[in-house]
Amino acid sequence: MANGQYLQFVDADDSLISSNYDKCLDFIRFKDADIVLFDFATKEVSSAQLANNEVFSGTEYMHNNNLRASACGYIFKKNLLVNLRFTKGILHEDEEFTPQLIIRADKVYNTKVQAYFYRKRKESITHNKDKRWKLKRLQDTEQVIKSLQDKADLMPAKDRVAMLRRVAQLTMDYIYNIIILTRDE
């Protein structure tokens, strides 16, 4: 288990962009942020960018913004994890995890800073062409949608609306992926 107050996930092939990531850490140092969101770069970025100072609750953020669910796209307070874990055995498990995490936060900063270097790989799960994998991806997405819908049904009204917005986004992605992943090549 991690020892610090904050957690950051990093894929083994990727890295943090130090000068820009330091800007994100300032929100932790000086603003007591619960979650700091940042952008990915696919090319090396040399200069630090200015960060956005606007703060939202997690519910407000989800209600008013399209969520990028990658667990590598933010740093967060470890105490938000109470009874929240990734579902084992499913693809894109962060699609289920991230909205539940964000909705728990009181102070979310969306910096727009490119602080994470994402290395594109042909062998990644998003590029897999195997039919069994495509079917699993669709089934797992459906499972995530149902899970978030069930959780939304138990939430207070304001949180429920925000979570249902995310469910609607995932449902549209699911429909799109059915078309893309099942068409003849």
Which functions belong to the PLM regions below?
Residues 11-16, 34:
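The conserved acidic donor/metal-binding loop of glycosyltransferases
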Residues 7:
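Short aromatic/hydrophobic "clamp" motif used to bind/position activated sugar donors
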Residues 1-3, 23:
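Glycine-rich, basic loop-to-helix element that forms the pyrophosphate-binding segment
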Residues 39, 46-66:
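Short, flexible, basic/aromatic active-site loop/helix in glycosyltransferases
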Residues 4, 12, 40, 88, ...:
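Short acidic donor-binding/metal-coordinating loop in glycosyltransferase active sites
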Residues 119-185:
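C-terminal subregions of glycosyltransferases and related glycan-biosynthesis enzymes
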Residues 19-48:
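Conserved donor NDP-sugar-binding/catalytic core segment of glycosyltransferases
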